[in-house]
């Protein structure tokens, strides 16, 4: 028939005129006109429509080459927890990078992107746990959290922030006051209004007090002192853990001192409040730089906060701050710890951000524990599903539980003590499995105290 002969190109022209994107019954009856080899659109053509300054600011999004390594589904793979839980490619680093790429092409940072599409981009980025796995596990290091926060900053210039954002943003500066009225704080976070705001399973403040001296105007001898840099989570929700680190500092013949508490700004950064984060980071950096220049050793506890001093702070204040993870400091003094009384075993689960930014973190812990006669099991795990405050948001509840079930659920019960370095990981395990995990510092301090009493 003529329709498949001379008239077919005419049908193709009609199809092209009325359905230029080939969205209606693609491939049925007539397809669009064939493209020439040099007419196939390439990624670079779209990228060149983005102005150079914006391309530089969002370089990690534009670096995605589509290799698809982020589609791994193994529970032992750290990348990407949100994709493994949803199997939705929009919730993978590749999907998010592609969406942000198109948002940039449309002029999103200047408010010129299609509003319906822009909301879809936000939904994809809301699902990101900011675990940083993609920043190292991706072959081209597509760092989704780095451009996620910039998108959120641009989005909230034009859209009101939800109450949960405001509540989480004031958490760090509010905690010193809240700790003075802990029963009132605990009552407040247990009220139904918190779920209405969009938050649940919030931790409670303990009645414990912290008996570690705080630095004042008169500074101790830097050669004898070790400064604990407090973070909001362990300082106020787990003061006993800070005391355990102080015990270990004393065990090696040093004096523990607590740096004056200052907010780190980590929750501000995750929320895309970059201006407020920079101001907070500069204040904290001024204090820590002064202490470092005075010759003090600085040690943090919470991995996500401690690592932020060398990562997010580098961009915010132009320098990485030398705050050590606890195992890094312990590794240098472990030979001074009391000799072990007996051999033992334990299982260690590291915070996903810690394992990503410091792949050797678990190995360093193993060396430290070996000095006190403990062999550490270090099973490969992904994210626990809490990721700071992400799992505390009601909207993320189902995905958070699914992520935990895929990886951590099978590791938190064992015949040996199970230890976890992340505060949010310990919270998540208690919420999802009803299991209370200890920090490795607490297990180590207990072991050392027993040895010291006997000897």
What residues fall within each predicted segment?
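Immediate flanking context of iron-sulfur cluster ligation sites
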Residues: 51-75, 115-131, 253-261, 372-382, ...
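Ferredoxin-type iron-sulfur electron-transfer modules and their immediate structural context
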Residues: 1-127, 146-160, 169, 183-184
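Cys/His-rich zinc-coordinating "finger/knuckle" motifs
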Residues: 71, 77-78, 87-90, 135-141, ...
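Short cysteine clusters
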Residues: 64, 70, 80, 128-134, ...
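Short His/Asp/Glu-rich catalytic/ion-coordination signatures at enzyme active sites or charged loops
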Residues: 103-107, 130-133, 137, 272
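Conserved aromatic-histidine-acidic binding/catalytic patches
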Residues: 2, 52, 126, 135, ...
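Iron-sulfur cluster-binding electron-transfer modules in prokaryotic oxidoreductases
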Residues: 19, 26, 33, 145-455
């Amino acid at each position: 028939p003529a329709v498949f002969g001379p008239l077919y190109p005419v049908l193709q022209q009609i199809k092209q005129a009325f359905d230029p994107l080939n969205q209606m019954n693609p491939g049925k009856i007539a397809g669009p006109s064939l493209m020439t080899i040099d007419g196939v659109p390439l990624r670079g053509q779209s990228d060149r429509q983005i102005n150079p300054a914006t391309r530089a600011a969002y370089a990690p999004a534009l670096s995605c080459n589509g290799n698809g390594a982020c589609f791994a589904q193994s529970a032992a793979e750290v990348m990407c927890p949100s994709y493994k839980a949803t199997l939705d490619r929009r919730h993978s680093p590749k999907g998010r990078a592609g969406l942000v790429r198109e948002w940039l092409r449309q002029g999103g940072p200047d408010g010129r992107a299609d509003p319906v599409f822009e909301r879809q981009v936000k939904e994809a980025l809301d699902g990101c746990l900011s675990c940083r796995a993609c920043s190292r596990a991706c072959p081209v290091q597509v760092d989704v959290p780095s451009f996620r926060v910039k998108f959120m900053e641009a989005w909230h210039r034009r859209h009101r922030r939800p109450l949960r954002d405001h509540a989480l943003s004031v958490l760090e500066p509010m905690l010193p006051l809240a700790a003075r009225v802990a029963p009132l704080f605990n009552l407040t976070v247990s009220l139904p209004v918190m779920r209405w705001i969009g938050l649940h399973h919030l931790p409670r403040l303990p009645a414990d007090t912290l008996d570690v001296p705080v630095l004042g105007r008169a500074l101790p001898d830097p050669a004898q002192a070790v400064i604990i840099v407090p973070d909001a989570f362990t300082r106020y929700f787990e003061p006993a853990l800070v005391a355990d680190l102080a015990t270990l500092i004393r065990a090696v013949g040093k004096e523990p001192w607590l740096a004056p508490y200052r907010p780190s700004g980590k929750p501000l950064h995750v929320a895309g409040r970059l201006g407020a984060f920079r101001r907070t980071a500069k204040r904290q950096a001024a204090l820590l730089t002064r202490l470092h220049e005075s010759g003090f050793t600085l040690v943090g506890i919470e991995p996500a906060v401690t690592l932020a001093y060398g990562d997010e702070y580098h961009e915010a204040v132009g320098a990485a701050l030398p705050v050590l993870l606890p195992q890094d400091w312990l590794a240098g003094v472990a030979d001074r710890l009391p000799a072990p009384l007996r051999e033992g075993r334990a299982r260690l689960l590291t915070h996903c951000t810690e394992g990503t930014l410091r792949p050797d973190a678990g190995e360093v812990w193993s060396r430290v524990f070996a000095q006190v006669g403990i062999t550490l099991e270090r099973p490969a795990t992904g994210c626990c599903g809490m990721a700071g405050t992400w799992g505390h948001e009601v909207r993320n509840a189902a995905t958070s539980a699914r992520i935990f079930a895929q990886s951590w659920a099978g590791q938190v019960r064992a015949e040996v003590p199970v230890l976890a370095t992340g505060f949010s990981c310990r919270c998540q395990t208690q919420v999802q499995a009803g299991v209370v995990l200890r920090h490795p510092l607490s297990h180590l301090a207990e072991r050392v105290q027993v040895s010291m009493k006997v000897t």
